Swiss-Prot record:
It is found in: Cytoplasm. One of its GO terms (biological process) is chromosome segregation. Site-specific tyrosine recombinase, which acts by catalyzing the cutting and rejoining of the recombining DNA molecules. The XerC-XerD complex is essential to convert dimers of the bacterial chromosome into monomers to permit their segregation at cell division. It also contributes to the segregational stability of plasmids. Residues 2-88 form the Core-binding (CB) domain. HAMAP family: Recomb_XerC_XerD. It comes from Bacillus licheniformis (strain ATCC 14580 / DSM 13 / JCM 2505 / CCUG 7422 / NBRC 12200 / NCIMB 9375 / NCTC 10341 / NRRL NRS-1264 / Gibson 46). NCBIfam families: PRK00283.1 (NF001399), recomb_XerC (TIGR02224). Residues 109-294 form the Tyr recombinase domain. The active site is at residues 149, 173, 246, 249, 272, 281. Its main location: cytoplasm. The gene is xerC. The lineage of its organism: Bacteria, Bacillati, Bacillota, Bacilli, Bacillales. This is Tyrosine recombinase XerC.
Length: 304
């Protein structure tokens, strides 16, 4: 297919420089485009500029028949729609065949979150006498205290911290920045790590690393590394938890709203562009639901 590499190179530069997307978002976009490129090759379509709306429908039908989830298909549509919007802007194609495609309706699922007792146990398993244990504790406390995305956590530098006001400057999606405060537990864990564990880890580095959270070799910690660390910490707990890093973000939002925080403030803290993205967290935990019921229903208690 002609000019594919040129198209992709230009698009990647656009995502990096103009949109300021993370490398993980860009990898997802490129994967969707390459998947579409393979489809075009099988269909005998010569180039991106030759794609029509019926071709897009066939592609999406095949994706559905392969068993891809609505969420995955939506991501592919979003990536390809953005790609064609870019190509159209650069006058490399004459139309965007994905404009007429609507995103599949998503199943409304309540985000999984941790209860406070589960969190407390997780906070007790790190060995604070070791550099890695200090890092793990700071990582856990910071994810829960700020609700930031793992990619945002991994990109934090010391210059982003304001230890006088206990706030952190987070560099979010699309060049958007926001300040998030953090509490005394996160501050204590962070101080221990910065003053001890991180300094020891830096001694193992081949070159100075500006990022706050480091791997065991003194290099920058990756989101994949965070997932591994969480998995190892969970193994040390007594329960059968299955935790992914984003669950701590879900937990952050759920706990704030359950304790009375207003939706707009939580939206700001999470860095959501749309309030609808935050509203998914307005579910009520089963414990709170039961307490409310038992406190207010006239026939909740016999003999009242």
């Amino acid at each position: 297919m002609a000019n594919v590499k040129n198209f992709l190179t230009l698009f990647i530069e656009y995502l990096q420089i103009e949109k300021n997307y993370s490398k993980y978002t860009i990898v997802g976009y490129i994967s969707s485009i390459e998947d579409f490129e393979r489809f075009l090759h099988v269909q005998g379509i010569k180039g991106f500029e030759d794609v029509t709306y019926p071709d897009v429908r066939i592609f999406l039908t095949e994706a559905h028949e392969k068993g891809l989830t609505r969420r995955t298909i939506s991501k592919k549509i979003s990536a390809l729609r953005s790609f064609y919007k870019f190509l159209l802007r650069e006058k490399l194609v004459k139309e965007n065949p994905f404009l007429l495609v609507s995103l599949p309706k998503q199943d409304k699922r309540i985000p999984k979150f941790l209860y406070e007792k589960e969190l407390e146990e997780l906070f007790e398993v790190s060995d604070l006498s070791t550099p890695l244990g200090q890092r793990n504790q700071a990582l856990l406390e910071f994810l829960y205290a700020t609700g930031m995305r793992v990619s945002e956590l991994c990109s934090l530098k010391e210059s982003d911290l304001d230890l006088f006001l206990d706030t952190v400057l987070v560099h979010g999606k699309g060049r958007k920045q926001r300040y998030i405060p953090f509490g005394s537990f996160a501050r204590e864990a962070l101080d221990l790590y910065l003053q001890n564990g991180r300094r020891i880890l830096l001694l193992k580095a081949k070159e100075p690393c500006p990022f706050i959270f480091l791997n065991q070799r003194g290099g920058p910690l990756t989101p994949r590394g965070v997932r591994y660390i969480l998995g190892e910490l969970v193994k040390k707990t007594s329960g059968t938890l299955h935790i992914h890093p984003h669950m701590l973000r879900h937990t952050f939002a759920t706990h704030l709203l359950n304790e009375g925080a207003d939706l707009r403030s939580v939206q700001e803290l999470l860095g959501h562009s749309n309030l609808s993205s935050t509203q998914v967290y307005t579910h009520v935990s089963k414990d709170m639901l039961r307490k409310t019921y038992m406190s207010h229903h006239p026939r909740a208690h016999k003999g009242k």
